[in-house]
């Protein structure tokens, strides 16, 4: 869905703002707003369109759908621009300080190893408990197989489990 849509050119820099973070879309009310501000306002507009009093009062369903879709599309466009900005900054960082990127990669790999080790330990614990259950079942099976297997074996086994009557004193 998103792969066919190419992000637009990066927003122009404005004095006094972090490079590239300023956004001046055509027709914008606030020319000094940042991408983050635009993202926040478009996100709020998505919710505002859903709870608008016009929609509650019974406006045409197609009109509601169109308005919501426009708000969501604007939010997605600004989100793509913001993502593009951060990807550009990440690329600049990787060119200027490649050791920092390597440190981050090593840290991520260590965290992944710790997570996987914990998962292995969890599975080993479960495996040991199931092995114990199987050993108990095998032990019970061996006890029953040691019992005599004659025609009266069932009665002998059942009577072995009945406690002897107590003698009155």
Swiss-Prot record:
Pfam families: Med28. Residues 99-137 form a coiled coil. Keywords: Activator, Coiled coil, Nucleus, Transcription, Transcription regulation. It is found in: Nucleus. Residues 1-35 are annotated as: Disordered. InterPro entries: Mediator_Med28. Its main location: nucleus. GO terms for cellular component: nucleus. The keyword Transcription regulation applies. Belongs to the Mediator complex subunit 28 family. Component of the Mediator complex. This is Mediator of RNA polymerase II transcription subunit 28. The lineage of its organism: Eukaryota, Metazoa, Chordata, Craniata, Vertebrata.
